[in-house]
Amino acid sequence: MENIMTLPKIKHVRAWFIGGATAEKGAGGGDYHDQGGNHWIDDHIATPMSKYRDYEQSRQSFGINVLGTLIVEVEAENGQTGFAVSTAGEMGCFIVEKHLNRFIEGKCVSDIKLIHDQMLGATMYYSGSGGLVMNTISCVDLALWDLFGKVVGLPVYKLLGGAVRDEIQFYATGARPDLAKEMGFIGGKMPTHWGPHDGDAGIRKDAAMVADMREKCGPDFWLMLDCWMSQDVNYATKLAHACAPFNLKWIEECLPPQQYEGYRELKRNAPAGMMVTSGEHHGTLQSFRTLAETGIDIMQPDVGWCGGLTTLVEIAALAKSRGQLVVPHGSSVYSHHAVITFTNTPFSEFLMTSPDCSTLRPQFDPILLDELVPVNGRIHKSVLDKPGFGVELNRDCHLKRPYSH
């Protein structure tokens, strides 16, 4: 009889943060909105707050970067550690150290689903269907997968059953799709800059931006728009039709997450051949089931916000059963190891975090060491062949641990 590997138990869980409202601006890391000045991601981009003049020029003006990065580390009895990052900052540290720790410490490193279910159940009364608490749970879940992979000596994608393709191809999100094309990406997604409060003039301006990029990128390069919850159904429908002559591939997250009926109406009225996508700010499997029922074409969960890798795998299975695609919101290595195992994820997102989109910078820089970037718009599965998620924590980032237990 062959010996079965004895797995260690989890001895410690620890939580740090960097950046956020209590730190110097521009820390980056898991909260990739926390950038310095003159960065495209904090330019005049349409948001739900754009209707207020005091908050229309910059997303940081209304506090998009106040949370900062949460770092969760889990340590096994044998001294091996796993970690992950997300957007939850100091408040996430409190939740981990003062509440979730009881469900983690003392469990076997393979008890990921048990821990996940207990975290969801224990926070249900104050978590709702997403947000800060779900970000924190996601971060813990990812750290557990990282630890499990390191203990057994396998990359996370092999723990999920292995790759279904040799490489991942990417589109780039940023202000310069023309530069993304030169770098080998299959498409470029731009933020919109105007919203319903700008009326038809706003529609004309964003449509002109798409037209300009279509001329620069040629007829076949994918172009998409990210609307970041800033529109209503009528405005989004008019914008979609205004952009249809320029072969817009999809229009993304036009409405707030809870407006399921609005997404159903938008999908029904969108131009033929143009896809409607959303999901970045949805959390929990149940919310994605409701979103799937609207008939949108692509669901876009963020693995660091939706409940972690455990939930992302469930969302992908749900979408597959309905013939829908899952293309996660860009989350670097945490997405790479998942999507290379999904048959309904033919491409993925890479978020351009360099200020002017002219260079490739790792998304969670500087908090992750050895973080991958695409080469000619692609990442081959062979570069994922390191235990866990294949990255290490940069402990020179002035990590702060405000709580302990």
From Swiss-Prot:
Substrate binds at residues 33, 59, 349. GO terms for biological process: amino acid catabolic process; carbohydrate catabolic process. Mg(2+) binds at residues 226, 252, 280. CDD domains: MR_like_2. Binds 1 Mg(2+) ion per subunit. The active site is at residue 329. InterPro entries: Enolase-like_C_sf, Enolase-like_N, Enolase_C-like, L-Rhamnon_dehydrat, Mandel_Rmase/mucon_lact_enz_CS, Mandelate_racemase_C, Mandelate_racemase_N_dom, RHMD-like. Its cofactor is Mg(2+). It catalyses: L-rhamnonate = 2-dehydro-3-deoxy-L-rhamnonate + H2O. Homooctamer; tetramer of dimers. This is L-rhamnonate dehydratase. It comes from Salmonella paratyphi C (strain RKS4594). The gene is rhmD.
